[in-house]
């Protein structure tokens, strides 16, 4: 992580009982010591509101990737998997794009995918995933909630998982935004 670049962290996504939700915290950090913003919006609706996308990593890089991913969604008529694979191939194959420091979670009602700059497109086995500095905390909390509090909605699971991450990770705050499909 560059000491002068702006970074944003912790995105969590879950599909549960026919619902889909994605949550992101609001913290943007300059290097490793300064909080630059506490109310960033890192989860976006794309493709006429049918797709959610969230990022962890460099803010400027993530916006570039959002634009490219939305272009791919348009090109492939909203086909999430095809758009994600095409973005990953372009990202991996382009010398300038390979320099981007961000990861994406993208989801629609039917699938959740993580897209990385090394060309991976990964679908989680258990319909939940998290990325960013607090990702492991959010993922652990989410798995526990899914197993032992299945009466919760996807939105509640997403919020509570990120809340746990914000209690532990110094790069994740509790200004949580949740989007649902």
Curated annotation (Swiss-Prot):
The keyword Transferase does not apply. Its main location: cytoplasm. GO terms for molecular function: metal ion binding; threonine-type endopeptidase activity. It comes from the Bacteria. Allosterically activated by HslU binding. It is an enzyme of class 3 (hydrolase). A double ring-shaped homohexamer of HslV is capped on each side by a ring-shaped HslU homohexamer. The assembly of the HslU/HslV complex is dependent on binding of ATP. HAMAP family: HslV. This is ATP-dependent protease subunit HslV.
């Amino acid at each position: 992580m560059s000491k002068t670049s702006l970074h944003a962290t912790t995105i969590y996504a879950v599909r549960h009982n026919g619902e889909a939700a994605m949550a992101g915290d609001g913290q943007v950090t300059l290097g490793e010591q300064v909080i630059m913003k506490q109310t960033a919006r890192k989860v976006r609706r794309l493709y006429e509101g049918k797709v959610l996308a969230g990022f962890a990593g460099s803010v400027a890089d993530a916006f570039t990737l959002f634009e490219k991913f939305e272009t791919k969604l348009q090109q492939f008529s909203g086909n999430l998997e095809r758009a994600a694979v095409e973005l990953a191939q372009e990202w991996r194959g382009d010398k300038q794009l390979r320099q981007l420091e961000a990861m994406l979670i993208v989801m629609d009602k039917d699938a959740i995918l993580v897209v990385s700059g090394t060309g991976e497109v990964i679908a989680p086995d258990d319909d939940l995933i998290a990325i960013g500095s607090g990702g492991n905390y959010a993922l652990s909390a989410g798995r526990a909630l899914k197993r032992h509090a299945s009466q919760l909605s996807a939105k509640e699971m997403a919020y509570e998982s990120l809340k746990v991450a914000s209690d532990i990770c110094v790069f994740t705050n509790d200004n949580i935004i949740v989007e649902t499909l």
